[in-house]
């Protein structure tokens, strides 16, 4: 795992799961995509901060659980610079905590799910339409199963009448 790195940015010291737990998620995603070197910034922020980011970049004036920013290498940057950098993930722990309670999920399980979700966005996965969402959700379910975490979408499907 020496070639996989998460830069934790948690200036206000919000409570988060162990770094090893999240690094294991990165390892799973990297292995699945045959990635041997990867670096990610994980920014831990308040609800107010993520609401501002959500408004600025997604035109949604409300807090959200996670926002991912895939790294786009600027033209002219030498190939050997930032080759392994996937991008930035911003997470609001208070939103995750509320969601976990509302959905009767273990908090660490929900963290792992949402972090994997964000990592997949950095690799180009999306859920803009039903087909893309199905591909992304199925991959999340598969990766979470390797961590011993149940399908996080089952309860939501039942609530949504799917």
From Swiss-Prot:
Enzyme class: hydrolase
Gene Ontology biological process terms, A to Z: rRNA processing
Source organism of this protein record: Francisella tularensis subsp. tularensis (strain WY96-3418)
UniProt record similarity statement: Belongs to the endoribonuclease YbeY family.
Residues annotated to bind Zn(2+): 117, 121, 127
Taxonomy of the source species: Bacteria, Pseudomonadati, Pseudomonadota, Gammaproteobacteria, Thiotrichales
Domain of life: Bacteria
Keyword annotations: Cytoplasm, Endonuclease, Hydrolase, Metal-binding, Nuclease, Ribosome biogenesis, rRNA processing, Zinc
GO MF entries: metalloendopeptidase activity; RNA endonuclease activity; zinc ion binding
Entry EC number(s): 3.1.-.-
Record's subcellular location: Cytoplasm
InterPro entries in UniProt: MetalPrtase_cat_dom_sf_prd (IPR023091), YbeY (IPR002036), YbeY_CS (IPR020549)
Protein name: Endoribonuclease YbeY
Pfam family, one: YbeY
Chain's role: Single strand-specific metallo-endoribonuclease involved in late-stage 70S ribosome quality control and in maturation of the 3' terminus of the 16S rRNA.
Cited PROSITE patterns: UPF0054
Cofactor remark from the record: Binds 1 zinc ion.
Cofactor: Zn(2+)
A GO term from the CC aspect: cytoplasm
